[in-house]
Amino acid sequence: MSDTGRKIMRVLSGESLSPPPLWLMRQAGRYLPEYRETRAKAGSFLDLCYTPEHAVEVTLQPIRRYGFDAAILFSDILVIPDAMKRNVRFTEGHGPEMDPIDEAGIGSLNGEEVVDYLRPVLETVRRLREELPAETTLLGFCGAPWTVATYMIAGHGTPDQAPARLFAYKHARAFEHLLMLLADVSADYLVAQIDAGADAVQIFDSWAGVLGEKEFEAFAIRPVARMIASVKSRRPHARIIAFAKGAGYQLKTYRQKTGADAIGLDWSVPLAFAAELQKDGPVQGNLDPMRVVAGGRALEEGIDDILQHLGNGPLIFNLGHGITPQADPEHVRLLVDRVRGGA
């Protein structure tokens, strides 16, 4: 099917649709009993990511259950440092961990074999495009260089990413080298996903919000702009969503300077400001995931507010970050029905 039949691709081209198409970040996840069952079969989390049979299954589960307008490849933003031999591991109750990198380690990093290492993920993309309904958009993704770098520097997640911020101040040249290497490798990875069958891709910058104004320009905007320019120079028709969580008022500059086709919004972005951003192009978001957990009027009012402010322009309805394990699957059903006008 051409892009004209896939609603999300139409919005990414600037079209306004009513009702808007929707998908949810982390829609394949622990809130679904069928996901938990497949996760138990797979073994480790990375085994789940790297085994196409399992990764395809968990990607398709929310499509079967809810009929979302997009399926997003089941993987993780940290597969790139894993491919760079940083010993990435996911421990229950601790989140992702890896061997922290220092200045010397950055100098010896090699990104040449990353895409080859991630062939199982690309096989998952190929199989998904074959198995998905023709009208369903297939989204690939990767992490933004800043967010991936924060984990590589600290070796784990931290509340405000202070280790990476400090490293960037003390070792500016090495840190810039790391960001640009990640930008180039990530662009190669996105091109490979597009070639394998992804209709569009999303860049996740989950920790953009901890950066000051100058650092946001240097660490969030510049590397992502480099990525997007690289992808589009090779695949001019590629559609790219960029999600810089916590970027706030800097999102207007972020859109202009990165060249993203659509901007993802977290739930803290005021809807009046979101409507201003929408005048420059498509937006995606931005329901608070806690409203999905709460259900009832909290869920209904959150949905209605977004549709009232953004529903007449190019909008992909989504959450402002990933759905949480505490979400009731029935609340997600109510969300889908209400966005589509059935509630």
Swiss-Prot record:
**Which keywords annotate this record?**
Cytoplasm, Decarboxylase, Lyase, Porphyrin biosynthesis
Reaction(s) catalysed by this chain, per the record, are:
uroporphyrinogen III + 4 H(+) = coproporphyrinogen III + 4 CO2
* GO CC terms in record: cytosol
Specify which residues bind substrate according to the UniProt entry for this protein.
26-30, 76, 151, 206, 321
Q: An example of a Gene Ontology BP annotation on this entry?
A: protoporphyrinogen IX biosynthetic process from glutamate
InterPro entries in the record, alphabetically?
Answer: UROD/MetE-like_sf, Uroporphyrinogen_deCO2ase_HemE, Uroporphyrinogen_deCOase
What is the protein name stated in its UniProt record?
Uroporphyrinogen decarboxylase
